Amino acid sequence: MDFLEIVGQVPLKGGVEISGAKNSALPILAATLLSRQEVKIKSLPQVADIKAMALLLQNLGAELEWLNPHTLQLSTKSLHHTEATYDLVRKMRASILVLGPLLARFKECLVSLPGGCAIGARPVDLHLKAMQQLGAEIKIEQGYIHAKAPKGLKGNDILFDKISVTGTENALMAASLAKGITRIINAAKEPEIAQLCAFLQSGGVEIEGVGSSELKIRGVESDALNLKDIQIIPDRIEAGTYLCVGAITNSQLKINRIIPNHIQAITDKLIEIGFSLDIQENSIEIYPAKKRQAFEITTKEYPGFPTDMQAQFMALATQCLGTSIIEETLFENRFMHASELQRLGANISLKTNVATISGSTELTGSDVMATDLRASSALVLAALVAKGVSRVHRIYHLDRGYERLEDKINALGAKVLRLKEK
C-alpha cells in the first residue's frame, strides 16, 4: 500500500492542467451500454474509479481499446452478460449506474449492491424506486438487485423525494429507451448531468429542461441508441482543490483547462476570504491574499457550495483569521477528516453536522490517515503548510479521484514522495 510523504512550507508557483471529470466520465461510460455502435470517449482521467468502471464494462462483454492514456474506444454491440458481480461493483458506488442502461436495453439484469467511500447513507432506494416507476420488477436477492421488465420500460413521472445525482443519471439512461415520455421531477442539476444529457441527445434521445430540476425525456423507439464520440468536461472538484492548494499556501497559481461557471460557488467563497482571482474563459489565476478572513459554508446541491469541496475548505480554514463554520447538509458522517486535521494541530470542534474551525493555526507535520476521497486531498493541503514532514496513509482513496496528484503538485515546486508502506 502506498503513502505520501510531504515536506511542508515549500513555496509554490506555476500552473496546473485539470483532468477530465471523473463524475462525468462514470455515467457516460455506463451509458455506452445503451449503444449498438463503437464510441470514442476522450479526456478520461487516469484514476482508479475509471479503471474499475472500464473493467466492469469489459466483464459485461464490452470490447475496449485505449487509444492513448485518456481516450477509450469501446463497443457494446456484442454484450454477452447482464450481471454486474460483487467483486467488481464493491470497489465503487458508481457501479450502480449500470442498472438503468442494462435494464433498458436487455429487459433484465443482476447488479450487486455497491461499495465506495464510507461517508454515510447513500441509499440505492431512490434508484430502485425510479426503475419501478418505469415498470420494472425489483427484488433484492443475496446482495444483488434483480431487475426485470419483460415488456420493456414505459415512460412515466419519476419524483425524487431527495435530490440524487446518480439517481437522476440512472433514471435518464433508463428513460432513453423507455416507450413514451418520462418526466424526472426534483432532478439534480450538476454540469455532469448536463453532459450526460448531451451524450444521450447525440444518440437521438429528446431531452427538455437540461440544467433545470425537471427533465422531460422522450425515449427512442429502438432497442439501442447510436451514441456519438464525446470529450469529458474538466473536473470542477479537481479545479477547486488546486485553487485551494494556492489558497492554503497563499501562492500565485494558474489553473488551466476549466469551465469557471461550473465552480462559481467556490470562486465566490475564495474572493470573500480575501483572494484576488483572474478569471478567464478556460483558466483561473489565484493571487496571494494580504489577509485571509474566516468564512461560513453550508453545503448544498449544485449550483450551491459542493459537498465534495467541504474538506478542502476545512483545511483552508485553519489558515484563516477568526472562526469559520462549515455545515454539511448532504451527507452524514462526512467530517472524518476533522480528527486527522487535529493531529496536525488544527483547532476544530464538531457538533452533529456543523464544524467550527478557529484560526489561524500553525500546523505541524504528523502521520495522518485518509478516510475517503475528498478527505485525503484535505490532508494533503494541510500537509503542504505544516511545519516539517507529514505522511498521508491510505491514499488509495486519493487515487480513486485525483490523477497524478503528487506529480501535478511537485510541478508547482512541492516536495511530495509516493512511497510503499513497510
From Swiss-Prot:
Protein name: UDP-N-acetylglucosamine 1-carboxyvinyltransferase
Stored InterPro entries: Enolpyruvate_Tfrase_dom, Enolpyruvate_Tfrase_sf, MurA_subfamily, RNA3'P_cycl/enolpyr_Trfase_a/b, UDP_GlcNAc_COvinyl_MurA
Organism of provenance: Helicobacter pylori (strain HPAG1)
UniProt pathway: Cell wall biogenesis; peptidoglycan biosynthesis
Active site per the UniProt annotation: C117 (proton donor)
Family listed: Belongs to the EPSP synthase family. MurA subfamily.
Binding site for phosphoenolpyruvate: K22, N23
Domain of life: Bacteria
Gene that produces this protein: murA
A GO CC term attached to the entry: cytoplasm
UniProt catalytic activity: phosphoenolpyruvate + UDP-N-acetyl-alpha-D-glucosamine = UDP-N-acetyl-3-O-(1-carboxyvinyl)-alpha-D-glucosamine + phosphate
Keywords from the UniProt entry: Cell cycle, Cell division, Cell shape, Cell wall biogenesis/degradation, Cytoplasm, Peptidoglycan synthesis, Pyruvate, Transferase
GO biological process: cell division; cell wall organization; peptidoglycan biosynthetic process; regulation of cell shape; UDP-N-acetylgalactosamine biosynthetic process
Major place of residence: cytoplasm
Residues that hold UDP-N-acetyl-alpha-D-glucosamine according to the record: R93, R122, P123, V124, D125, L126, D308, L330
NCBIfam families: murA (TIGR01072), PRK09369.1 (NF006873)
Gene3D superfamilies in the cross-refs: Enolpyruvate transferase domain
Pfam families: EPSP_synthase (PF00275)
Single GO MF annotation: UDP-N-acetylglucosamine 1-carboxyvinyltransferase activity
Enzyme class: transferase
Localization: Cytoplasm
Residues recorded with modification 2-(S-cysteinyl)pyruvic acid O-phosphothioketal: C117
